[in-house]
Amino acid sequence: MTGLERQLTEMLEAPVGALGYELVGLEFVRAGEHSTLRVFIDHENGIFVEDCAEASRQISAVMDVEDPITVAYNLEVSSPGLERPLFKAAHYQQFVGHEVSLVLKMPMNNRRKWKGDILEINGEIVTVTVDGNNEEFALSNISKANLVPKF
């Protein structure tokens, strides 16, 4: 998570929470004049289009006042979806036993991409069973983590 993403998360957690939603996480993708702020929200009863619209209006209002992003961007608000991104240690704990796809910032054993089942989370270390071996990953070295849907 970048410094800007951390700042945005702290700024948006309370307003999104006040609407009754969980701010699962967010990502800011810089692409010149096509930059995108993706905000993922959830609710115990699921997320519907109306929920995303309501959260989008609230987030837009906060962003207009605080103005933390200096470039033009598009705001996308959605549910985490089937390939739910994992941002926090609590997310890994919630999905122990589920398959996850990881992309690392720095390679481990000459690999940046890993896929396996979440075994446990201990502090800032997540243990994933990959091909029968338990591998430990520092959360600080994970650039992207998503659940792998089962069909």
From Swiss-Prot:
Keywords (A to Z) from UniProt: Cytoplasm, Ribosome biogenesis
GO cellular component, one term: cytosol
CDD domains membership: YlxS_C (cd01734)
Membrane spanning residue stretches: none
Keyword Cytoplasm: yes
Keyword Cell membrane carried by entry: no
Coiled-coil positions: none
Biological processes, Gene Ontology terms: ribosomal small subunit assembly; translation
Subcellular location: Cytoplasm
Task of the protein: Required for maturation of 30S ribosomal subunits.
Family named by the database record: Belongs to the RimP family.
Protein name per the record: Ribosome maturation factor RimP
